[in-house]
């Protein structure tokens, strides 16, 4: 099996040295991601494309799907690489490959050619197109907007029969730009903004300010792990959790009601800047959009930025909520965001939309900054790859079982698409499907006389959700790992 990786167009217009560096980094990223599927897989870089060759046909769909989610790839061609002798041989191979696909359809042939040959690309298009038209009675040629375009590539004595084209996410390869720290809350905005910076070539680390206890952190860990695993797993990143409840308590006690929102954001930027400086990160990323809430007016954003020298990136600054939600749906974080527990310890009855710097600074003079220093010092820093392991260590009260008893039911908490692609069937026990994002609202409707064994493919989500349900008072849950 062979895939041809086509580069994002912005890479191809770089200078020779920069283009070569980007291609080298992208090649390494592809190897890092795909080695989990096939250790014998070969990734070979060229000036115009990257080849991926693998032997394990069972991993074809998984490899193809993974490639479409690696930043820097414009599209992927799944090809069959065969030798040929002459133009008629090319036609015969094309006929065998595309006959069924062209039945009753309009088509055209498009050929790309590299190397020295006795024919041109146009001559191959005419010869193959004419032959297909003669040998497939129900098909007819249509050069503009055909039903099917037959793509062929001729390189020296090899013919590439294009079996399928699949769009990538584009952007720059991760690692071509410097690291950033995303202030992630688990909602729509922060997830999308994190994705946008990954797509632009940044390694995105995550900083979470916990205002609402373990359940909130569990949910945010899920979002961060999902984003990393889906779009950024070629690189190691950090997940930093800061317990911000003491800071919120100090704000509630010492700060005027109308200034609370801006002061809280300033404290978050101060804390995140300290974390960024500690790890050599160049910029912060937030999901703020202009005018979305009271703290996101230009005046207030300027005051928030003033507390730190660290660059703050806001990729969603001009986006409306509908656009952001649509992007969240495309990248798969919508369901997380919709069910994310919302905690706001600082709720102003009449928040200011045009804060005055002198007044904000006067309010902050009452704040005990040693509290802020302490929570940053005690921040929990985790390699995002270890989230599963740490969850297992932390959730000692959630039992993990490999077997089942007469009163047990397996609860498949994967997404609907994953369940449809690979249904779970276990002999001797009932299996019930309930996607993870519906557990908070639907688990209570299940038969509570049963013991529910939560299952997902990697075991991360099942343990996190089991802890969440335990915290909600459900004692009849365990994690299932056969």
From Swiss-Prot:
Its main location: cytoplasm. InterPro entries: Rhodanese-like_dom, Rhodanese-like_dom_sf, Rossmann-like_a/b/a_fold, ThiI_AANH, ThiI_fer, ThiI_N, THII_Thiazole_biosynth_dom, THUMP_dom. Pathway: Cofactor biosynthesis; thiamine diphosphate biosynthesis. GO terms for biological process: thiamine biosynthetic process; thiamine diphosphate biosynthetic process; thiazole biosynthetic process; tRNA 4-thiouridine biosynthesis. Pfam families: ThiI (PF02568), ThiI_fer (PF22025), THUMP (PF02926). NCBIfam families: ThiI_C_thiazole, tRNA uracil 4-sulfurtransferase ThiI. Keywords: ATP-binding, Cytoplasm, Disulfide bond, Nucleotide-binding, Redox-active center, RNA-binding, Thiamine biosynthesis, Transferase, tRNA-binding. PROSITE patterns: RHODANESE_3 (PS50206), THUMP (PS51165). Its EC number is 2.8.1.4. Disulfide bonds join 344-456. This is tRNA sulfurtransferase. Residues 404-482 form the Rhodanese domain. Residues 61-165 form the THUMP domain. Catalyzes the ATP-dependent transfer of a sulfur to tRNA to produce 4-thiouridine in position 8 of tRNAs, which functions as a near-UV photosensor. Also catalyzes the transfer of sulfur to the sulfur carrier protein ThiS, forming ThiS-thiocarboxylate. This is a step in the synthesis of thiazole, in the thiamine biosynthesis pathway. The sulfur is donated as persulfide by IscS. It is found in: Cytoplasm. GO terms for molecular function: ATP binding; CCA tRNA nucleotidyltransferase activity; tRNA binding; tRNA-uracil-4 sulfurtransferase activity. One of its GO terms (cellular component) is cytosol. The active site is at residue 456.
């Amino acid at each position: 099996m062979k895939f041809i990786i086509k580069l994002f167009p912005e890479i191809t217009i770089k200078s020779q040295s920069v283009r070569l560096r980007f291609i080298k980094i992208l090649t390494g990223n592809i190897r890092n991601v795909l080695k989990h599927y096939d250790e014998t897989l070969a990734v070979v870089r060229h000036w115009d494309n990257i080849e991926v060759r693998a032997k394990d046909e069972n991993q074809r769909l998984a490899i193809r799907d993974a490639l479409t989610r690696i930043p820097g790839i414009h599209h992927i061609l799944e090809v069959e690489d065969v030798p040929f002798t002459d133009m008629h041989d090319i036609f015969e191979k094309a006929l065998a490959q595309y006959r069924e696909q062209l039945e009753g359809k309009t088509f055209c042939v498009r050929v790309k050619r590299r190397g020295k040959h006795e024919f041109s690309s146009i001559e191959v298009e005419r010869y193959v197109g004419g032959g297909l038209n003669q040998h497939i009675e129900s098909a007819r040629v249509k050069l503009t907007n055909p039903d099917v375009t037959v793509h062929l590539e001729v390189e020296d004595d090899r013919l590439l029969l294009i079996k399928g084209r699949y769009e990538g996410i584009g952007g720059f390869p991760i690692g071509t730009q410097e690291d950033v720290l995303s202030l992630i809350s688990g909602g729509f905005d922060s997830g999308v903004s994190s994705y946008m910076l990954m797509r632009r070539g940044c390694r995105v680390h995550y900083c979470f300010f916990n205002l609402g206890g373990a359940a909130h952190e569990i949910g945010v860990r899920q979002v961060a792990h999902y984003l990393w695993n889906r779009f950024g797993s070629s690189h190691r990143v950090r997940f930093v959790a800061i317990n911000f409840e003491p800071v919120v308590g100090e704000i509630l006690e010492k700060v005027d009601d109308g200034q609370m929102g801006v002061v809280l954001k300033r404290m978050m930027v101060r804390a995140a800047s300290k974390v960024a400086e500690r790890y050599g990160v160049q910029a912060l990323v937030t999901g703020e959009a202009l005018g979305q809430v009271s703290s996101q007016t230009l005046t207030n954003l300027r005051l928030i930025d003033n507390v730190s020298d660290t660059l703050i990136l806001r990729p969603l600054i001009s986006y409306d909520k509908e656009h952001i939600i649509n992007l969240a749906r495309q990248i798969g974080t919508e369901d997380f965001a919709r069910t994310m527990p919302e905690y706001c310890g600082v709720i102003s009855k009449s928040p200011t939309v045009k804060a005055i710097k002198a007044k904000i600074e006067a309010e902050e003079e009452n704040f005990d900054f040693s509290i802020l220093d302490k929570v940053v010092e005690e921040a929990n820093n985790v390699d995002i790859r270890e989230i599963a392991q740490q969850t297992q260590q932390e959730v000692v009260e959630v039992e993990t079982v490999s077997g089942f008893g007469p009163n047990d039911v397996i609860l498949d908490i994967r997404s609907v698409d994953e369940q449809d692609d690979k249904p779970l069937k276990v002999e001797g026990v009932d299996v019930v499907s309930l996607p993870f994002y519906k557990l908070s609202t639907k688990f209570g409707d299940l038969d509570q006389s049963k013991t529910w064994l939560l299952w997902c493919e990697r075991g991360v989500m099942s343990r996190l959700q089991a802890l969440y349900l335990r915290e909600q008072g459900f004692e009849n849950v365990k994690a299932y790992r056969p």
